């Protein structure tokens, strides 16, 4: 994307703005300057003014620092207004709801996320157990499950629920 016109948009939260700021910093260090840098409010629903600004700037790539709800709305409204810029984001959009909200326009979205643990052979039994309860273990579900298992093992080993003892184990 070195020669692309890139917008960096964020949701003004510590996560979203932090992600956007670090992405902007990394781009700028490589000589890539964003054409739009802007924050939006979480809970906002109408991004038509933002999309108009992106279109006027000729944006080809939108980097989104934020979560799936606003990200989905932004990509839907971009497509509705004829802006076919590539959407790129971090793990905050790692949810089936992003696609539900964003619609078919999310096709081709690029995102960063650690490897999907659902495909690992040692996760097969846990994935099957979640699915048997009609739960799709998406995004961080299995990482969270593994963290709880580690805490449980430490509590069992120390025969204590004292957080300090569990943490020291």
What annotation goes with each model-predicted range?
Residues 1-169:
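Extracytosolic ligand-binding ectodomains
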């Amino acid at each position: 994307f070195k020669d692309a016109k890139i917008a960096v948009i964020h949701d003004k939260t510590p996560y979203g703005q932090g992600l956007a700021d670090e992405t902007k910093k990394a781009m700028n260090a490589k000589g890539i300057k964003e054409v739009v840098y802007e924050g939006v409010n979480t809970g906002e629903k109408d991004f038509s003014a933002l999309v108009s600004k992106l279109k006027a700037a000729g944006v080809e790539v939108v980097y989104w620092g934020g979560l799936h709800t606003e990200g989905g709305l932004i990509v839907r409204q971009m497509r509705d207004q004829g802006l076919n810029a590539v959407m790129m984001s971090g793990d905050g959009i790692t949810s089936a709801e992003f696609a539900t909200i964003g619609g078919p326009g999310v096709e081709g979205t690029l995102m960063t996320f650690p490897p999907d643990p659902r495909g690992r052979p040692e996760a097969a039994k846990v994935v099957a157990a979640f699915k048997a309860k009609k739960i799709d273990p998406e995004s961080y579900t299995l990482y969270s499950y593994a963290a709880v298992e580690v805490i449980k093992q430490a509590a069992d080993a120390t025969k204590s629920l004292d957080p300090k003892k569990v943490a020291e184990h």
